[in-house]
Amino acid sequence: MKEKISYLEFERSDFVPLLKMAKKLWADFKEDELQHLLEKSTESQKYRIIIAKNPLEESVGFSIFSIRTDYVEGADKSPTGYLEGIFVEPEFRKLGIANKFIQLGEKWCKEKGCSQIGSDTWLTDKESRAFHLKVGFWEEEEVVHFLKNIK
């Protein structure tokens, strides 16, 4: 099955399946907000979206990488590549798809002048944290964000 997965640059016709998968990854986002963020990403040269498709040409995963010129925690220099999101449908996991996404993303980031890739996840997301460590990331720091309304 692994060799039958194709990895393709995002095309406009991939938007509906991308949004459907992104809603599974980022379930806390409102759909219109997520749609807006994805549309901005698909229109920018600072992002690379890769879609994995099965032999039936059905989308089974995606990855989004970006080039960041703002501060990335722990990065040695700028620009820094960034793994914005990665998702593989449950029935297609453990086939090496996520690893291939990482390889393709690293290659693109190197081509854009990056020597490191950052990423983030929620402190409580043990599955994501384990995945990041498995594919070669290290934990840079743990942060809790605060907010206060002012009157």
Give the positions of each predicted feature.
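Conserved acetyl-CoA-binding loop-helix of GNAT-fold acetyltransferases
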Residues: V88, K94-K107, A130, K134
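Conserved active-site alpha-helix within GNAT-family acetyltransferase domains
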Residues: N99, E111, L123-E142
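Conserved beta-strand in the GNAT
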Residues: I51, E58-I67, Y82, F87
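Active-site rim helix/loop that mediates acceptor-substrate recognition in acyltransferases
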Residues: F29-N54, I64
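Conserved beta-strand-loop-alpha-helix junction that forms the acyl-donor binding cleft
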Residues: S119-S128, L147-I150
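Conserved GNAT acetyl-CoA-binding A-motif
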Residues: I102, C109-T121
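Helix-loop element at the rim of GNAT/NAT acetyltransferase active sites that forms part
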Residues: L19-E33, Y71
